[in-house]
Amino acid sequence: MCSMPHRFRRLPLAAAIALTLPLPALADTPKPTELDRVQVKVSTATRSERLLSDVPIRTEVLRKEDIALRAATDFSRAAELINGLRVESNCQNCNTSEVQLLGLPGAYNQLLFDGIPLLSTLGSVYGLEQIPAGFVDRIEVVKGGGSALYGPGAVAGVINLIPPLPARSGGHVQAGMDVLKGTPQKNADVRLDLVAKDADAGLSVIAQRNWNSGIDYNGDGYTEITRKNLKVGGLQAWYAPTPGTRLRLDLQMTDETRRGGNRLDQPEYLANIAESLDTKYRRGSVSWDQEITADVDFRLAYAFADIDRDSFYGGLGDVVTDPSAPGYDPLQLDPDVAGSAASRSWRQYGRTHNPLHYIDSQLNWRRGAHALAFGVQYKHEALRDDNRTGDGQRLAVLEDATFHNLGAFIQDEWSLRDNVDLVLGARVDKSSELDNAVFSPRIALAWQANPNLKWRAGIATGFRAPEIFVEDVHVDTLGGEQVRVRNTDGLKEERALTTLFGFDWRSDPANPVWSWDATASYARIRDTFALGEIQRGDDGQLSQLRYNASGSNVMGAETNLGWQPSPQWRLTAGASWYRSRFREPQRIFDDTGDGGDTVIESRDYLKTPRWTGLAQLSWMPAEPWETFVALRHTGPMSVLNNRLGELHRTRSFLVTDLGARWHRHLGAQAQQEVSVAAGVKNVFDQRQKDLEVGALRDSDYVYGPRFARSWYVNLRYAF
């Protein structure tokens, strides 16, 4: 494998910049203290709105100003702006992705919308790209499982998408384009907010569309970026009949088609490789927040998600499809000819239905130095996955499962002193997949050592039950053949213990020119779920077996540095280091059963770099302008190529983005705004160079930056 140029290898990661601090707002020229992240109000850590500097459990924030400056159109692109939070692509054909947190894969964190779980099992496959930025006011990230308020599997933390709550009627219209390899990726969205005069009720209507043609990076005729057409519509409504009551309704409907591979103008079964998805996703929630007295309040919420998906994973494989090419055989393209390639691919269609229901309740009682929280949560999910023919006939039921989890929690936020907060909590969860309930204690401590320095520590336990996972409903392909995942008999639950210790420092609480924080973490996972090598079964199908490994350990550290000498300049820097390893080597490749002689074992988590970092310098030369230069570093990682039977250590990547934003206020009260954002993403085109090619490619062999160099422009009118 090639390596990063010498000058980049020596670049100190401590100089990489993380966007965990908010950027300057363009509407005004505020004082630096107004921009410091400790002044931001958050609600995720304790489910009560507090200043970020006061919460006892470490929380990081990405505000809408940050998202707008970088022209991020969906959550997957916005998430990459947070230090220690990494989006990894997992398929060259369909571009499914996951969010890694604390050095752990996406299955170990929980994605929330206004505090309520957002994605079902099937929704997690492509859901990161199906959440428009227009639905989000800010993103709050709680790393580690220090709060008992969230589910048992959130051992790496929670990512909470907070929706806007407009104070006046208005809205925006926005359109943009990224030009990548000469192909435009287009997006447009509109938002309309209607707010009552006394602001006790409101309605927001949102719509967004993203669409692009398939993009081929290496000219082999097979896409690296899927052809996609995403349409999203939704509404958010709220009503506060009394000062202590708030009712909220959120609805979202998503219609997405995506297809990757080759021969995109032909039916899927006539492509050498095709991964094609047609997804209908309906999601909603209703919540009731009620203040009973000054010391007692409660919240009740119900959420649902319902997904229907028609899919195709597979293809003809290495079959000649050009009539003028040597070896062309038209019978191979006829599904009615027994034994032909088309007769096999005709049977690779599928249909999946995945409903999810979630009920959440919480009672808060403040008494003296204690803030007690009690709650019950219930999740019910079903998944049916059928294998079908090209004309819709059912061949087999691949999955037909229903599972649920009933959890109860108690948490005491105890102010031991004016400068010491202790959070004691515990959960009891009964999963339908386990015989016994699981007790998960959690504790967090915060100590304000002086006005400039705050220390935090936390210990949490959690588990993951052996349910249906993302890998079961996303099907990898190897040479046009499906690779299915199944659980071994007697698969046990994972048990996890995570610990965190860190500090936050500010140079001057009243005028913070400098800020610095650092956190060390350690996670011990028992009976870790692991995927074995790809094998061909007695039925001739390729599959991977999920089993319990002996366990794994993940240790790491993150640090962020911020400097703002004036409202015009801001520099933020951060780096993360994580070592994610199994306790014993795991066999990840073995072709001896097919007559080969290659066996590969590894202790490392695959596609998990040890070093990552982010960087941004922003400058406001004049009130209408803001410019930035940003860096994103991804260190080497271990990646398996199943086609070659090789474990590769990748190169490092240093992605550079440049951009600017101009705006002008209009109207008598300057409530209207016109803005233009433009720039270049991935200026030096840092990305994977050894992409798999042709019909026999291993779709899972993809790593590093997801997008090649692109030019972008975004136009926005707010009113």
What positions do the PLM features span?
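Short acidic/polar hinge/loop motifs at secondary-structure boundaries
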Residues: 98, 116-143
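Membrane-embedded beta-barrel scaffold of Gram-negative outer-membrane proteins
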Residues: 191-192, 297-313, 448, 456, ...
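Gram-negative outer-membrane beta-barrel transporters
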Residues: 415-419, 515, 521-524, 545-641, ...
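Extracytoplasmic beta-strand/coil segments of soluble accessory domains associated
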Residues: 51, 76, 80-117, 137
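Outer-membrane beta-barrel translocator/receptor signature
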Residues: 120-122, 134-137, 148-219, 226-233, ...
